[in-house]
Amino acid sequence: MEGNMFAHIYQVRSDVFGTSYENEISKIRNEILTCIKNDDCPITPRFIMFKVMDRCNSGCIYCGYARQNHPDKDGCKSYILNTNELIDIFDQAAELGVDAIALNGGEPLLRNDIGVLTEALNKRRILPILMTNGVLLDSKWKELGVAGLKYIIISIDSLIPEHYEFQRGISYIAAMKGVQAALEMRKKYGDVIIHLTAVLTRYNLEDILTLVDFCNANRIWLEISVYDTYGMTEDKLSVTDRIGLKRVVTKLKELKKEGSYISSSYEYLNHLEEFCLEHNRIPQKYSCYSGYGILLLDDLLNARTCWGSQVGDIGNIKNSSLSEVWNNSKMRHYRKKMLGGRCGGCWNLCTEFNSMIRNI
């Protein structure tokens, strides 16, 4: 299996739905490049990241949900979308031809219908992906296994309890029980991709290589996420140790070449030092393709094509259909802005979509 998150998605789709991995990737790549050439847009987003729950049971020090209340338009506690509302959006996504939807939050396992949502996506031939802190997975993995979940992403920053709890604000033991639950799920239901994400900061820089060893031993993929300073009044987390960072990144690239379970692409790793040390910005003249394949929905159904600070809301699914939002003038504007490298934004997981399109 290729070491790239979006490549994994299409490889799992081929196993679950009987599609051709090579044909799907080639079709997406050709469609996007043709759309760019003809100043057009694809008929569908390929991947939707959906915040299906605004509440969270962890307190990550770098997360907006942990730093702020999230009121709705009436100034009250935010509205939690019900099952039927979500399934209606799944129907729209299926009609458009969306390939995968990641259920995240907040913490999606705080929902009582997470198994129902997973099954609903599978029935519509949309690959469900669960993005979780793992704490509640110990009590829900059997339900999710029966529902057909085949891709789990768990946030684990470190295997040192003190470092993990400092960054995540929740019990390390509980989170690791979630990882063990995912392993049990794979053992019982088979072919489940387990994928850890670690947010890189100055506090866990030296812990990352140990995480790689753990992932290799358990056939778990590891994605390195960067710490984004957007919205921060002060920055006490960014990596400043140039020598240490270079050593870790160099080793990560060596391990990936040797076949380690590192999901971050070479393109991502090649620019990781630049991002961490040069004011958290993407490389100059970087062309981002995510506007041609990715759509983000928050818990109030606001749609964006990027969480980056320079890319705003493009519409709301309550007021417009998914198709209308994907094709509206704001989306077209931001799509071109991102393609031209004028967003000045982030260096997060969407770069893996870019790597897939550029075949890097």
Language-model regions, residue ranges each:
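Flexible mid-to-C-terminal extensions adjoining Fe-S/redox cofactors in radical SAM and related proteins
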Residues: 1-44, 282-285, 289, 300-360
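Conserved alpha-helical substructure of the radical SAM core
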Residues: 2-151, 233, 240-241, 359-360
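A C-terminal junction/extension of Radical SAM enzymes
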Residues: 24, 32-36, 41, 189-193, ...
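Cys/His-rich metal-chelating microdomains
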Residues: 55, 59, 63-66, 291, ...
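Short, solvent-exposed loop/turn segments at secondary-structure junctions
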Residues: 55, 108, 136, 158-161, ...
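Alpha-helix N-cap and loop-to-helix initiation/capping positions
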Residues: 77-81, 167-174, 239-244
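Radical SAM/AdoMet-radical enzyme domain recognition
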Residues: 83-104, 110-226
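Short, solvent-exposed turn/loop segments enriched in Gly/Ser/Thr/Pro and often Arg
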Residues: 106, 265-267, 345
